[in-house]
């Protein structure tokens, strides 16, 4: 296993050494995937005198804590942190949360990133898509391909588990940080996205995460909120249900439930035609 990880790490370093001959623009969330890329890119440009810009989207469709985390981690890893503000809901089609919302959002976000890179005369624009992302419902990947965004982790067939292991080996502070996807994934498709509702959901998730380790999602179905946590955290969720219910009621949620299937990425995609 160690030999395999060392081989994967070497392939990543070799690829980034080539890209590092020029300035690099990286979509940077502060999550483990983009942080590993930033580490590899920073090491590469450190040998060539070029620069790597770690660009974070300031978007209300993403948890507010992400911006502060991204700024801190970018500084730790040697990237030049930049922020690009985007309001996805300016686009009416996105606001009504269609099944291809992820595609539309990615197209809008990464067009903004391309505009930034163009102003800086940067040719290499990257994101942290990994191998595993290619095998689940990720309509946003189509937008990345259309915009010719480079995804080194996916191109090198590096899986999420390998990303985490390599990041931990580098001592990256967010190596075990749970993923933090777009807040629109908390609502059913064809439900109008409302920033006030997403803010309440975000506060609820933040509160539960302060009590329970691991993944936490609040999925809202009209007046029912469905709590997803890792299966090993279910017992603790039940033990602390009184205070959690009280807090969620204060946030305006009516019916509060625990999903017995536990946390699973993309649970709102159940029943979709993935080939559509």
Go through each PLM region and give its residues.
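ATP-dependent adenylation/nucleotidyltransferase module used to activate substrates
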Residues: 1-169, 225, 243-253, 258, ...
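AMP-forming adenylation/ATP pyrophosphatase catalytic core
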Residues: 138-276
